[in-house]
């Protein structure tokens, strides 16, 4: 019996120590706005619960609004040409009731965007680049306006993605339970792969390659001349 009890006690102790090692920071209610200055960037990587607005403008002046003691634990830095925004290691942030952390990020031209967490990212102006990729992992949401020759999008989580704009070559990979609404993003060639329970709605005009191996559905508008579709799960592929 001791052989079974000792590992359980040891595991419980480790969990307790890990929890106690986290510095819990409760919002103090004092909402302030700070400007964080960085170098330029061509990628944006967010990890956390923040609400992010992407706006057109000169890169390097990041506006961040929230409770003062919460902001002190949020890191904004550029590393390897990527703007990274995340919480300080070892902290557990708890904003006050109804309080948020809102961040405005100016951009001129970025090639990559990623969010890991429960925050939301909204593009207030079009993201324009020849090649652009976006990745969402977690329960957060994307609302993006994209103009790109080549656009790669990945969703792994329960968050939802809403798109508009245009792309000659669109690639979407969905492996979570979230949905992708891209009927307002006009694409010429679309390659869609759904292996989760989420749904994808797209608009393509020339060619469509679609695969469903999960329970999600793919709906498409437009009249692609070339269609290569295959369903190996319980989902479906249909013209909307």
What are these regions (language model features)?
Residues 4-12, 16-71, 88-106, 122, ...:
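Short acidic/polar N-terminal linker immediately downstream of export determinants
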Residues 33-35, 41-54, 102-104, 109-240:
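Extended, compositionally simple hydrophobic/Ser/Thr-rich segments
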């Amino acid at each position: 019996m001791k052989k079974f009890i000792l590992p359980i006690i040891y595991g419980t102790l480790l969990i307790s120590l890990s929890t106690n090692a986290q510095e819990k920071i409760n919002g103090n209610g004092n909402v302030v706005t700070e400007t964080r200055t960085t170098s330029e960037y061509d990628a944006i990587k967010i990890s956390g619960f923040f609400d992010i607005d992407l706006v057109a403008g000169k890169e390097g002046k990041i506006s961040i609004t929230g409770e003062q003691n919460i902001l002190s634990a949020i890191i904004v830095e550029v590393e390897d040409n990527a703007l990274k925004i995340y919480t300080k290691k070892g902290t557990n942030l708890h904003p006050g009731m109804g309080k948020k952390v809102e961040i405005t990020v100016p951009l001129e031209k970025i090639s990559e965007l990623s969010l890991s967490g429960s925050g939301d990212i909204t593009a207030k102006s079009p993201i324009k680049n020849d090649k652009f990729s976006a990745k969402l992992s977690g329960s957060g949401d994307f609302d993006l306006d994209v103009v790109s020759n080549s656009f790669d999008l990945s969703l792994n989580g329960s968050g939802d993605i809403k798109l508009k704009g245009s792309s000659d070559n669109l690639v979407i990979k969905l492996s979570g339970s979230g949905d992708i609404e891209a009927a307002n993003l006009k694409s010429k060639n679309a390659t869609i792969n759904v292996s989760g329970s989420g749904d994808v709605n797209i608009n393509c005009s020339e060619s469509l390659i679609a695969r469903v191996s999960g329970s999600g559905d793919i709906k498409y508008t437009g009249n692609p001349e070339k269609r290569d579709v295959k369903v190996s799960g319980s989902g479906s592929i249909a013209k909307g």
